């Protein structure tokens, strides 16, 4: 079984883990209703994608 020969220091461990943190998502705005949404997705409030009506949304 493989065993490390020497102990890794805390600094070396933390430098390796520096890229593991969660990144903030970049919200886009719908071109039709200006609703905040994730990029490359259909707008859940109006049903538009890329300036075109893709699906119909029933109003509550």
UniProtKB/Swiss-Prot annotation:
Keywords: Ribonucleoprotein, Ribosomal protein. PANTHER family: 50S RIBOSOMAL PROTEIN L32, LARGE RIBOSOMAL SUBUNIT PROTEIN BL32. One of its GO terms (cellular component) is large ribosomal subunit. NCBIfam families: rpmF_bact. This is Large ribosomal subunit protein bL32. GO terms for molecular function: structural constituent of ribosome. It comes from the Bacteria. Residues 1-16 have a biased composition (Basic residues). The keyword Ribosomal protein applies. One of its GO terms (biological process) is translation. Belongs to the bacterial ribosomal protein bL32 family. Residues 1-20 are annotated as: Disordered. It comes from Chlamydia pneumoniae (Chlamydophila pneumoniae).
